């Protein structure tokens, strides 16, 4: 076996050691979370070796097969696809999870079930690794369902809270809708191609792939919270902050985008699928950016920004640039995890206060967290030479120079501008101005578990984009021929967003509105989506069932058994009685006439 898969699989199997140790039940102590964190850091360091060797060797793909089972028509094997996507993604995911695990030791220290929480986080990571390295649809489906069930368990971690239970159920139900598309695609590939192996599917390259690609797009819509199946993502903020950080950076939500990236050889020749993907991504990125503008919960602002960035990744796949979408997944993981961890630090220090209107002035009291939050927000907006710039700027450039839908491009540019606006708003309310929280709150951000984890991601948010984009192929970019205004478009719309946000803030600083405007209602009520989809159908269903039940009871049983049955019996009997008048003379006369006529007719004549 080649050294690449050997080392990579060693780092992946290292992750299973804490799970195996917990089942053996050798010893239970309070240091288990520390051991798990150390094991993930060890796995990250091991995974760097095969990744660097892979990058510099130039080998495209290495697959390791272990025969699993054979049915009458299908051969299933455990097959790991260690190609460009998985080899780059695994170290990024391990690095981010290592930081989140260390942050969790500080954030969840008072939780009595912290060891169980860490096992769930580790299982979450393992299932994502299965999904990323899978070479057949069955294995990919195991990872796909794994991240779904682990997200359910982690979002509903504080099961004593009704909102957490509702959010966990919402996440699993929306993902079920997406899973229908995935299973439909699996069934199509099995019935038409008799294979779930990715190489065989791409080699055969069927002509009519609209149906399976629509199924895969539906699956990605559910998992990556695209427009229509997006409401579960902001609701998922009911879970602990480390869960939000892991869910939004390198696991669950990027799984849908990763699925479409995996199937890009089929998508690149299908105009229908690409147009739908482009339009879906454009609608999502704009809609969620508008929703983020007026939110007051700090975690929900960051959650909507995640959904907006996922929409941008889907747009990138729609313009047939899967490698760029993948680059954005990798760079986005660093600063998004850091933003959530900074918000967790603020929430924890302010006694679980999440409303940005009740914060303010934190730049002086929490300088390290504030600095990290500002750098993370700048990286999110695509500020030059931070991590986000290396992928986001390229995406906007490529969209500008592509032969693509102008409407989708315009929506993407507006969403990019709004990203700067809501990031500025979050910084303005949270860190600047006078403190608006109670004076007796003790603020302490000096715990090494907190500072070390954020420091690592801070370094990643500044330098990771540079290192990743310079080490992945093509290492030499061909000369671009585009006008300067197209080259600077991403920067122009971002600066415009910053300027617009500050200008509107200053212009409306002393204004008071008695009634909220319609755009404000649309944004703060999330486009009326939860109201329409979560309130109307249940209320209509309840009303219809209540009416039908009452009608059935009243009309069919209560009325028919007593009042209607008595009246019906009386009418029938009265009709029967009134038909017999008792006129005996008339009866005898009619009998006599009938008898006489019959005798006359039947008597033979001589």
Curated annotation (Swiss-Prot):
Location within or outside the cell = Mitochondrion inner membrane
Q: Name one GO biological process term.
A: mitochondrial electron transport, NADH to ubiquinone
Keywords associated with the record: Electron transport, Membrane, Mitochondrion, Mitochondrion inner membrane, NAD, Respiratory chain, Translocase, Transmembrane, Transmembrane helix, Transport, Ubiquinone
Q: Does the keyword Flavoprotein apply?
A: no
| InterPro entries tied to this protein | NADH_DH_su5_C (IPR010934), NADHpl_OxRdtase_5_subgr (IPR018393), ND/Mrp_TM (IPR001750), NU5C-like (IPR003945), Proton_antipo_N (IPR001516)
Membrane topology summary: Multi-pass membrane protein
Q: MF terms per GO, please? A: NADH dehydrogenase (ubiquinone) activity
Keyword NAD attached: yes
* Spans traversing the lipid bilayer: 1-21, 38-58, 87-107, 114-134, 140-160, 171-191, 213-233, 241-261, 273-293, 301-320, 325-347, 366-386, 409-429, 457-477, 488-508, 582-602
Give the record's subunit note.
Core subunit of respiratory chain NADH dehydrogenase (Complex I) which is composed of 45 different subunits.
Known function: Core subunit of the mitochondrial membrane respiratory chain NADH dehydrogenase (Complex I) which catalyzes electron transfer from NADH through the respiratory chain, using ubiquinone as an electron acceptor. Essential for the catalytic activity and assembly of complex I.
Query: PANTHER family from the entry?
Result: NADH-UBIQUINONE OXIDOREDUCTASE CHAIN 5 (PTHR42829:SF2)
Give the protein's recorded name. Answer: NADH-ubiquinone oxidoreductase chain 5
């Amino acid at each position: 076996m080649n050294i690449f898969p050997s080392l990579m699989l060693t780092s992946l199997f290292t992750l299973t050691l804490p799970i195996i140790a917990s089942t053996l039940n050798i010893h239970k102590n309070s240091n288990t979370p520390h051991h798990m964190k150390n094991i993930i850091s060890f796995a990250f360091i091991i995974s760097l070796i095969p990744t660097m060797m892979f990058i510099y060797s130039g080998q495209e793909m290495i697959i390791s097969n272990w025969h699993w089972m054979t049915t009458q028509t299908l051969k299933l094997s455990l097959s790991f696809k260690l190609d460009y996507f998985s080899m780059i993604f695994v170290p990024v995911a391990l690095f981010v999870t290592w930081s989140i695990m260390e942050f969790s030791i500080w954030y969840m220290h008072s939780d009595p079930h912290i060891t169980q929480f860490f096992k769930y986080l580790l299982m979450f990571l393992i299932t994502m690794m299965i999904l990323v390295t899978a070479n057949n649809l069955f294995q990919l489906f195991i990872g796909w369902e794994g991240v779904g069930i682990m997200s359910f368990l982690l979002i509903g971690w504080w099961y004593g809270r009704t909102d957490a239970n509702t959010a966990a159920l919402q996440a699993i139900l929306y993902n079920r809708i997406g899973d229908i598309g995935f299973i439909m695609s699996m069934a199509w590939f099995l019935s038409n191609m008799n294979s779930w192996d990715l190489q065989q599917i791409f080699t055969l390259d069927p002509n009519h792939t609209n149906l399976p690609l629509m199924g895969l797009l539906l699956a990605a819509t559910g998992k990556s919270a695209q427009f229509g199946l997006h409401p579960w993502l902001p609701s998922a903020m009911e879970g602990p902050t480390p869960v939000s950080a892991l869910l939004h950076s390198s696991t669950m939500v990027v799984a849908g985008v990763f699925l479409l990236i995996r199937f890009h050889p089929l998508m690149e020749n299908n105009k229908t699928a690409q147009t739908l993907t482009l339009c879906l991504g454009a609608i999502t990125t704009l809609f969620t950016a508008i929703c983020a503008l007026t939110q007051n919960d700090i975690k929900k602002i960051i959650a909507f920004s995640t959904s907006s960035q996922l929409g941008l990744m889907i747009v990138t796949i729609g313009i047939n640039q899967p490698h760029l979408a993948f680059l954005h997944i990798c760079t986005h993981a660093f600063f998004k995890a850091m933003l959530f961890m900074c918000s967790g630090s603020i929430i924890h220090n302010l006694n679980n206060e999440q409303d940005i209107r009740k914060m303010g002035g934190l730049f002086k009291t929490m300088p390290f967290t504030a600095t990290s939050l500002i750098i993370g927000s700048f990286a999110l907006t695509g500020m030059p030479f931070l991590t986000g710039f290396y992928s986001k700027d390229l995406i906007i450039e490529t969209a500008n120079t592509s032969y693509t839908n102008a409407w989708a491009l315009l929506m993407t540019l507006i969403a990019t501008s709004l990203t700067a606006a809501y990031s500025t708003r979050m910084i303005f309310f949270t860190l600047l101005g006078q403190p608006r929280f109670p004076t007796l709150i003790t603020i302490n951000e000096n715990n090494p578990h907190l500072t070390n984890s954020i420091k690592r991601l801070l370094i990643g948010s500044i330098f990771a984009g540079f290192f990743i984009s310079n080490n992945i192929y093509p290492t030499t970019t061909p000369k671009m021929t585009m006008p300067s205004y197209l080259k600077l478009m991403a920067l122009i719309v971002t600066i415009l967003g910053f300027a617009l946000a500050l200008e509107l803030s200053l212009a409306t600083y002393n204004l008071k509105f008695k009634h909220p405007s319609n755009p404000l209602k649309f944004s703060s009520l999330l486009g009326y989506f939860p109201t329409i989809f979560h309130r109307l159908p249940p209320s209509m269903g309840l009303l219809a069932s209540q009416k039908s039940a009452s009608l059935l009871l009243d009309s069919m049983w209560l009325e028919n058994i007593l009042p209607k049955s008595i009246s019906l019996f009386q009418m029938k009997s009265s009709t029967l009685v009134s038909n017999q008048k008792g006129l005996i003379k008339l009866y005898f006369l009619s009998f006599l006439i009938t008898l006489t006529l019959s005798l006359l007719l039947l008597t033979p004549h001589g």
